[in-house]
Amino acid sequence: MDEYSSIYSQPKTPRLKQEGFPDSIGDQHEKALIDENGEEDKKMASTEGTTGDSRSTPLTVSIPTFENVQALPTPMTYTPLSPGNLSMSPIDQSSLNIPKRRSHARLLDDMLSVTQPNQRVVSELIAPANLSPQRVVSLPTVTEEALVNDSVDSDNYTKEPYFPESSSSTEKCDDDIFQGFLLDHWDRPLLWKKVRPIGSGNFSTVLLYELMDQSNPKLKQVAVKRLKYPEELSNVEQINTSLRYKETLSRLENSLTRELQVLKSLNHPCIVKLLGINNPIFVTSKKPLCDLIIKTPRALPPCDMIMSYCPAGDLLAAVMARNGRLEAWLIQRIFTEVVLAVKYLHENSIIHRDLKLENILLKYSFDDINSFRDSPIYCKQNFIELADFGLCKKIENNEMCTARCGSEDYVSPEILMGVPYDGHLSDTWALGVILYSLFEDRLPFDPPPNASARQRSRATSHRIARFDWRWYRLSDYKTNVGKQIVENTLTRKNQRWSINEIYESPFVKTIADTLSFS
């Protein structure tokens, strides 16, 4: 008996019965194996007779193919080879990994142009398709606001005290001459002449206008914020048939009236002023758009807000023009004024929900502010105005918010997680982001300097949720009092400072006590 015969003559392993398989499958496999072995014996014998080397031919391993098996056990997890009728986990379509909204290499002229840079957004409304992919002034979800009635009836709405013919059509709104009314002076229209565009966003355009008669020096130059209507509202004829139209109209109307009512009630040096409107109905009616649709059924009439004008532009553009090199005293002064503005809002039960560098406007350039340091005007004059109240909300005591809104670089982890959040603490989180950015010339949740490709591939929302930030420029400054604010705001909500705690910190309090306008 040769070595191959001795192998095949070994006792066979007992065959075990397997649940769920036909009894004959083992017999078929065994028969196939014996047939193969028989053929292999003949081949090996022939080879051995010619070469004399029994090690030249390896054994053949036979694998059963289970031709007669009709069904296999259900897999525990989904794999690419699983049957097509298995259900898979739903794919998350709401990724917050949105392309970067800015570049440090941008020229100042580009920043001051009409087209603004792309910006990352957190919003539960999709931006209109026919508009540029800039920051979305998102409308709150219906969980925070009630919808209008299913039918639009003129009996349900308030009649406006005065309806100016000059603003009854969109075409007239595009002229270089703009007619508007100061708040509570509806009987005296004023005329302004367009100078140039200032900026543009997904839901508004801002233009600079000059008063034509020069009768009031304070109104010589104003910023006119012109509302853009979403694409869903372009076809007014759908008002009685489209549920989507009614819901979009309701959200826009709620957001617009809330912003106007809040701005009308505010009076603080460091907050932008609402001076007037192109049509009084926008501030006198609870449902101005529905009222105006009845009067002008073919198109929504324009809404132009007359705002105070800040000639030096926004803080982000000014910082980038300096390549991020700001003196410590200047950072401390500007941040103190921002804190004063937010403190005033919170004391009046208003949350902003969109605090960021772009929404802080400068009344004077940095060079002008520096020239004021040794003069009495330095403590008597405010240098910034907080703007863009499109996402603001007046809330009750201990009220929690649910709308996921804001700009992704500045939103708190609880907003990203989609859980109810304290709007006051979401504002103080954003203040921490602002102060860090002024200190470090970078956003705290951007990829770190000299980051690897893997680190850069992580979404900003991922770093925010992990509180993944650190100091770079100020890493060696252990006694910087401003660092204390950042470290106590970019943290968990149960440890996060309130606006009063920020105000009482030495970094803010020492400057605030010297200001006479606050």
Swiss-Prot record:
GO terms for biological process, alphabetical: negative regulation of conjugation with cellular fusion; negative regulation of transcription by RNA polymerase II; response to pheromone
Catalytic activity: L-seryl-[protein] + ATP = O-phospho-L-seryl-[protein] + ADP + H(+); L-threonyl-[protein] + ATP = O-phospho-L-threonyl-[protein] + ADP + H(+)
Biased composition annotated in UniProt, kind: Basic and acidic residues: 16-45
Enzyme class, spelled out: transferase
Annotated InterPro entries: Kinase-like_dom_sf, Prot_kinase_dom, Protein_kinase_ATP_BS, Ser/Thr_kin_YKL116c_prd, Ser/Thr_kinase_AS
Location of the region described as Disordered in the Swiss-Prot/TrEMBL record: 1-59
Modification N-acetylmethionine occurs at: 1
A GO cellular component entry from the record: cell cortex
Active site: 354
Positions bearing Phosphoserine: 132
Pfam family, one: Pkinase
Keyword Magnesium: no
SUPFAM superfamilies named among the record's database cross-references: Protein kinase-like (PK-like)
Localization of this protein: Cytoplasm
Entry's EC annotation: 2.7.11.1
General remark: Present with 1510 molecules/cell in log phase SD medium.
Homology family: Belongs to the protein kinase superfamily. CAMK Ser/Thr protein kinase family. NIM1 subfamily.
Function, in words: Protein kinase that functions as a regulator in the pheromone-induced mating pathway downstream of mitogen-activated protein kinase (MAPK) FUS3. Diminishes transcriptional induction of genes in response to pheromone signaling.
PANTHER family linked: MAP/MICROTUBULE AFFINITY-REGULATING KINASE, SERINE_THREONINE-PROTEIN KINASE SIK3
Name the record gives this protein: Serine/threonine-protein kinase PRR1
Gene source species: Saccharomyces cerevisiae (strain ATCC 204508 / S288c) (Baker's yeast)
